[in-house]
């Protein structure tokens, strides 16, 4: 594990260009390095999971030496028993020249209903009725606005704070904070691939039918309660729609767009995305979820819960259901339900274990993460104090001299190589 504590902010920089730190609420957050493809990002997300597991093992070894024993649990989920929520944030780079407001507004209907294809599932007790039921999304009950600059108290679906973490004259960041933390890699790939396709379409000026909800927050909660995708919500333009209808329209539009889009290295994954997207909608509409029972988190978890309820003759209010809901998100191999199911081939895996192991210490070669990762590695090897964030690198011994990383796609230059070789 090649990690370094940076300054006094409790931020740890990884040699693969990623970041581990304590977020609001003192829970650990792992932020992956910049990636330029879905497959690359899947690999680095998985590398982050394995890094967290390794740190937990180290912590348990330290506890055994100093306190006798102790177990460290790491849950990759979005809510706790006290009603707090922590997000799985997605950051998409878009052109500054595009109309950010137009794209954000057009994206809202897709994001409100996206939980139907990539929700993590949640056993939830309704505080108003006292009834406990199964919902599509963990995050849906914890957002309170459609589009705003807030991130915590009044969480929006899309955060509009203009912090591109890149050349602000060229880029903006589409900061989506409504998503659930996915466990199954196909769910993650569908979440990312579908959103990327829709963003590409919107940047190209391709408009989709107007499904903007009359109240996005009311709509997102209605959708979360409707496992069949058929729960109607009001539209701003009048009438009603459903998650199934909205996702069908977006999926069809994305498929048509992909037919005319120039072929590149992303094309195979995008075709795979359209396939799983359609299969998921078909399965939900038919009521037979078997075709996606190894791919979509909320479906996998629901199957586990249904078997447990049938075995014990209980409903969702039984504490064992809440426990199962939680431990599905335990990332620790040998203990967590998800790692066990995946290891037995009961959940599909997309990443290559060899590539994941490499990604734990080696940054992507195609983004500025390569520069940051090489800088961190050099400093760790040399025992040199340093400071590094998403857009700046500097040695502690010469804080007035720093390198700016404003181009996310610049992976190395001769000038930066010279800077890195300098030991401060």
Model features per residue range: what roles?
Residues 1, 16, 132:
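Glycine-rich, flexible loop/turn motifs
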Residues 1-7, 11-12:
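Single conserved hydrophobic/aromatic residue that forms the stacking wall/gate
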Residues 11, 33-35, 58, 118, ...:
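Generic recognition of cysteine residues
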Residues 13-72:
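Signature for HUH/AEP ssDNA processing cores
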Residues 41-46, 189-198, 277:
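Short, Φ-rich (hydrophobic/aromatic) sequence segments
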Residues 70-82, 86-239:
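Loop-rich catalytic cores of soluble enzymes, especially ATP-dependent carboxylate-amine ligases
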């Amino acid at each position: 594990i090649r990690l370094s504590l940076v300054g006094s902010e409790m931020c740890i920089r990884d040699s693969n260009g990623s970041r581990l730190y304590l977020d609001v609420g003192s829970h650990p957050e792992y932020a992956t390095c910049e990636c330029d493809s879905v497959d690359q990002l899947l690999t680095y997300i998985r590398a982050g999971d394995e890094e967290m597991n390794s740190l937990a093992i180290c912590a348990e070894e330290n506890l055994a030496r100093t306190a006798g024993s102790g177990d460290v649990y790491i849950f990759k989920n979005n809510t706790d028993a006290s009603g707090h929520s922590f997000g799985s944030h997605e950051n998409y780079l878009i052109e500054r020249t595009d109309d950010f407001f137009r794209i954000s507004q057009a994206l809202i209907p897709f994001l409100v209903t996206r939980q139907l294809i990539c929700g993590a599932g949640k056993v939830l007790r309704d505080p108003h009725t006292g009834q406990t039921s199964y919902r599509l999304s963990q995050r849906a009950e914890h957002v309170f606005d459609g589009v705003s600059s807030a991130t915590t108290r009044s969480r929006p679906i899309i955060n509009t704070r203009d912090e591109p973490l890149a050349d602000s004259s060229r880029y903006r960041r589409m900061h989506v904070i409504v998503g659930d933390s996915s466990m199954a890699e196909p769910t993650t790939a569908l979440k990312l691939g579908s959103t990327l396709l829709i963003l590409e379409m919107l940047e190209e000026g391709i408009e989709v039918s107007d499904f903007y909800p009359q109240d996005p927050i009311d709509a997102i909660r209605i959708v979360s309660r409707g496992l069949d995708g058929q729960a109607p919500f009001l539209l701003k333009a009048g009438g009603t729609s459903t998650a199934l209808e909205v996702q069908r329209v977006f999926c069809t539009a994305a498929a048509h767009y992909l037919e005319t889009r120039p072929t590149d290295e992303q094309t195979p994954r995008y075709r795979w995305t359209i396939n799983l997207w359609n299969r998921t909608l078909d399965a939900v509409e038919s009521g037979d979820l078997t075709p996606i029972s190894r791919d979509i988190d909320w479906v996998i978890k629901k199957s586990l819960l249904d078997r447990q309820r049938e075995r014990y003759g209980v409903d969702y209010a039984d504490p064992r259901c809440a426990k199962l809901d939680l431990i599905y998100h335990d990332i620790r191999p040998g203990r967590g339900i998800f790692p066990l199911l995946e290891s037995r081939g009961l959940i599909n895996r997309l990443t290559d274990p060899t590539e994941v192991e490499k990604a734990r210490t080696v940054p992507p070669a195609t983004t500025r993460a390569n520069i940051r990762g090489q800088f961190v590695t050099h400093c760790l090897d040399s025992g040199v104090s340093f400071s590094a964030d998403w857009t700046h690198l500097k040695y502690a011994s010469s804080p007035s001299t720093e390198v700016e990383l404003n181009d996310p796609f610049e992976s190395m230059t001769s000038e930066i190589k010279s800077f890195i070789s300098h030991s401060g």
